[in-house]
Amino acid sequence: MKKNKTAEKYLAQVITPKWDIIFGSTVALGVILFFFGWGWGYYFSILIVIVGAAGFILARSARVSDEDYLGIIDRILADNGIEKNASRGEIILSSFLMKDSEVTRGIDKTLRSGRYCTAEFVFSKGECKIKMHTIDVKDGSVTCDTYTVPLTAVPAIQSEDVETRFGTVKQNTLVFPDTGIAIPVDTNSADVDEVIRRFGR
């Protein structure tokens, strides 16, 4: 399957302020020379500012933005008819899968990976139907698993340490004991607490 070059680039890039600092300092030097230079320094300062500004813009434009990467995920969801927003009576949990995935740190410092999971919870009398989609962002493939769980089940959050190139991170999973069902979740989402609250009855 053809890989998405933009997704590949995003997952491989490492955001460092090095070039921003270098080109920003170059612009600052040019401005100082412009105001305090004399003779050829005055004209040379204009060239320094132009070079520094151009380098700064090129360094920034060479990056794949967080919005571009999230846009790829949104397109995959839409192309496969996967709902991003919950309908009435449903809850949708979404999270990046850190375990066994290529992990990167975005421009906004948030950790993201090459695999994205959504789980749709549809509650009815006595049971809950769960439809979980796992997306491989680079190749655009989607797998789907469907489960039916009684509302008497008592789910729990399990945390696992996962080693990445950015150090150790937590992989949180919503687990239904004795079922083999494990759903990656973002525990910062209030919807996770709401899902747990609806079980154990």
Can you say where each PLM-predicted feature lies in the sequence?
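Anionic N-terminal interaction surfaces
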Residues: K2-I15, A53-F121
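IQ-motif-like calmodulin-binding regions
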Residues: T16, D20-G24, V195, G200-R201
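Hydrophobic alpha-helical transmembrane segments
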Residues: W19-G24, I32-I50
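Generic beta-strand structural signal
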Residues: F121-K125, S159
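Structural motif
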Residues: K125-E127, G180
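Short hydrophobic/aromatic-rich beta-strand segments that constitute the beta-sheet cores
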Residues: C128-M132
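Short, surface-exposed beta-strand-loop junctions and turns on beta-sheet-rich folds
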Residues: T134-K138
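Acidic, Ser/Thr- and proline-rich intrinsically disordered linker/docking segments
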Residues: S141-R201
